Regions:
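Conserved, structured C-terminal
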Residues: 1-158
């Protein structure tokens, strides 16, 4: 505990790490990234090496040609006491349009933040949605693609 105190370092835990990664838009395997979503839906198309053959290439090329039907988004959720749980339903105009994959209070941005997947036509910045948290629908707004905090990655230096 004493090592690092002179540099302002303090102990922290998994909840802090989770909050920080969600504010940055970093996705976690098995929660945010899984076989439930294609690489294009996950916004990771830049990592596809189209110059080499791979299983599922034709299906992925067809999806790329028509456009992914779902997209990952970052949401600011208008709730101050509960985070959006894993797989909370996301609503628009009275219909389920997606699900959350992660949620936490964003201490740097001072708001509840959720990552989720929604219909592609609703993935635009400013789109008003609702996230169901323990049976109550709570207003949420789609944020600009990218980190909510430290967009230029200036804080993430070792």
């Amino acid at each position: 505990r004493q090592a690092g105190q002179g540099h302002g370092l303090r102990p922290f835990g998994m909840f802090a790490l989770n909050s920080l990664r969600i504010e940055k838009g970093y996705r976690a395997w098995k929660g945010d990234l899984s076989t439930d979503y294609t690489v294009l839906q996950a916004g990771l198309g830049r990592f596809i090496d189209w110059d080499h053959p791979f299983r599922g290439r034709e299906a992925l090329a067809a999806e790329q040609a028509r456009g992914a039907d779902r997209r990952f988004v970052t949401l600011i959720v208008a709730h101050e006491t509960h985070d959006a749980p894993y797989m909370s339903t996301i609503w628009h105009a009275g219909k389920v349009v997606g699900e959350t994959t992660s949620g936490a209070w964003g201490h740097r941005v001072g708001a509840s933040v959720a990552l989720g997947v929604v219909r592609a036509d609703l993935a635009q910045e400013g789109t008003e949605l609702e996230v169901e948290i323990f049976g109550a629908r709570v207003p949420a707004r789609v944020q600009a693609d990218g980190p909510l905090y430290d967009r230029d990655n200036m804080r993430l230096r070792a």
